[in-house]
Amino acid sequence: MSKFWIRFSEILTPILSWILLTAPFWASFVFPTIVVYFILVFDAYFLYKAASLGINSIRSYLKIRQTTKVNWLEKLKTDYPDYNKVKHIIFIPTYKEPLSVLERTLTFLAEQELPAKNLIIVLAGEDREKDFLLKADLLKAKFNKLFFDFLITNHVLKKDEVAGKSSNQLFAANVVKDYLEQKKLDKAFLTLTSCDADVSIHPKYFSNLTYLFLKNPNRYQRFWQGALVFYNNIWRVPLPVRVVHTIYSVMGVAELMRASSNFIYSTYTGSWVLFEKTGFWDNDVISEDWHLFFKAFFANEGSLELESIFLPLYADATEGQNYWSSLLAQYQQNRRWAWGVTDISYALSQFVKHRKNISIPNFVLRFIRALEQHLLWPVNWWIITLGASIPPLLNSELRYTTLGFYLPKLSGLILTLSTFFLICIISIDWLLRPPRPENVKKPFLILTILQYLTLPITGFIFGALPGMDAHTRLLLGKRLEYKVTEKFDGKKN
């Protein structure tokens, strides 16, 4: 594709988003009947999404309970006695994370059901962090003997690179590639996990992963994804942040049921063969996970699958030094995630390049899922919250028609039905959330239910606004810088 078409494909999604979110305003005068039906269809779509979230979260939770009850190590010993030939490389990209947070992450890895001697730790730091090597040496001294090996990489940012997780892990991958050649490890039995520095991986994750890896003959065209739940510090963060991450956590659980159209994110695993064939990560992207999935998809001519691991991965909710810095950090994190809209252009350009070798239905399924996510990110709140009120308010002629009169009533009915599935979200969150700390008073528990009353506000501040921000920046050609979300161990200055 030429530069013109690449740029056009970049701005197309933001343009469509702005057209849709402003439609209730301008279309109320130009196409009043059409905009009414558009809003009702959109509300029905939201009801479908709410129902899917509620039902799939319950189904997934039941599967998580089943998975946690299985002794996967015993199953390995019975079904695959030579399971020790599988080694798991774990990248932990870090930049200014507190020592205690990294210790927690490594402790969870050391206490896996699968023997820790099957794990190779790669602590991937940035040269920009002055104390990284000192911190890394302390961690290696404490944990080195527990694992198969403990490697440290120190990434020096180059001029043509974008600071962030992607460029860091590409550097680490090239270092590890040389390491594997020296150690003469069998690459056919290696997996690579990208683990966010704050993520505590469930103790059964790698034993379950090993079983699934050995069981599946298509292991080299496959990613594995667990359920990311933001519960490490959920009792400590401000209420608006807690609401956002509660919804994200339940969504992470529910999405396990949609592996055929889902994407990898945050903490995920693939075979080393798959990563090497793909060329690992790119060094000039911010949102690396969906981008990597599409890159691997085209590198394998569309023969790529995602398999869910029905186990939780415990992450930190966004937290700052104080209340307001926490809210700002949450906004910046969501804006960074919304910047993944750039993946739409990347996917289109790669499809044009590889279209002769790619199954169109296979590509369309993934592409529509990505387009739905990013196209509607800035739009959802406006249509759902204000959409039904605006056309009759702006167009007096529409107001006195039957269609205009019933629009707010029908829309309200559909959205009321949607709130029924909020019960599912509250229930699954309650079942998965860690026990209440002693320093959290019981009356605080009431807020865990009342907090959902703030959804219209939090949805705008942490959903619509960062989405509009990211889309507008892309539309105007203003690139986004990677801002690392701060991590805390509960001790703040």
Q: What feature does the model see in each segment?
A:
Residues 2-99, 103-107:
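N-proximal low-complexity "stem/linker" segments adjacent to membrane-targeting elements
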Residues 18-50, 54, 369-476:
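Membrane-embedded multi-pass helical conduit in multi-pass membrane proteins
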Residues 65-342:
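Internal catalytic domains of large membrane-associated glycosyltransferases
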Residues 69, 351-362, 434-447, 486:
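Juxtamembrane inter-helical linkers in multi-pass membrane proteins
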Residues 107-121, 396-404, 474-493:
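Hydrophobic alpha-helical transmembrane segments and immediately flanking/interface helices
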Residues 297-383, 387-401, 459:
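C-terminal catalytic/acceptor-binding lobe
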Residues 324-333, 337-349, 447-492:
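Membrane-proximal soluble regions of multi-pass membrane proteins
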